[in-house]
């Protein structure tokens, strides 16, 4: 050990973890050590830069709360979250996209046709579609979990004066695999910009805007669940989303609903517009 140098220390560190808990853990840890050491050698990382990086990570931990996970935000703006989604989009299902920091697992079970906007003003949108398998068959009883920002670009969970469960819904598809509900059109917003990740974006002369979107988590028995987003054609940030979440296949078209149009659903609130988007679930492995 006393004879290690900058070229042999990598193997020495890997060898020090002799008692591995699993083959997968061993593989991941070895690769992490290798890439971290390679980065240090390739960049000739200074001690000041090394310490700055550690302090940056410390600051990410300090500002994090159960409602705000700065490390997820860091992963998002570095494209790591998006890359993980791309690597894990398999089997012909709908492409994955960012979970984001504002998902709550206890969203209320919501009847089809409900209005999750809770009387908020703005453009009222009918969000609807069919959940299918990869053969095109509808999936009755699939669970469609959704959450979003409001018409001012805020999630209710960010505002103590609002009910954190507003603008969220958990729907079960009907016998035809359909989901449908109304909500308010969300607004583009910036990711949290007041912490270390915001400092990183400013240092890189990057904007912090997200293209407006709905979040979805969709699952069904014996199918692989998906976490994804639906974006809106023509949005200002569709080609420069701060967290690299947009995929061409996830862009929906917002269509105006005439006031005298006959709608195929029984809805709690009359919509001004609609976005039709089908989800595809692949079989579970």
Model-derived regions, located:
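Beta-strand-dominated extracellular/periplasmic modules and repeats
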Residues: 2-285
